[in-house]
Amino acid sequence: WREELELAQSYLSIEKYRLGERLQLEWQVDEVPGGLLIPQLTLQPLLENALIHGIQPRIDGGLVRVEGRYRDGVFELCVSNPYDPGAEDKPSRGTHQALLNIEARLGAIFGPQARLIVERRDGRHFSCLRYPCASLPQEA
């Protein structure tokens, strides 16, 4: 998890430079052990989707929130961004390939209990993953 988080933060530092004040970030990941297993390039594509579909189209930008927790052997991670209900009328340019790829990799590694859930509620778009896994011991 630590390496995945560092990669995501590096990516966002570039996007923050590009988008400026339009991109607001909120991280709630303190409960996630640094050694937790997560496939490489899982978080970054979720963040990229949040920026492309939730921040870039909005003149005022918005808040991307990353929430992660590890409890009772289950890891949950949600990336959310602003969602405009009127956007459903516009044709999507995306192929959902990143989400399909993440879902397939989670299933292959963590089995049928692994889930990727995408939903819209309360003016936000949520991409959430949940899977059982063992946490590696924290390094001193």
Predicted features, each with a name:
Residues 130-140:
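C-terminal end segment of the histidine kinase catalytic
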Residues 1-119, 124-126:
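Two-component histidine phosphotransfer core
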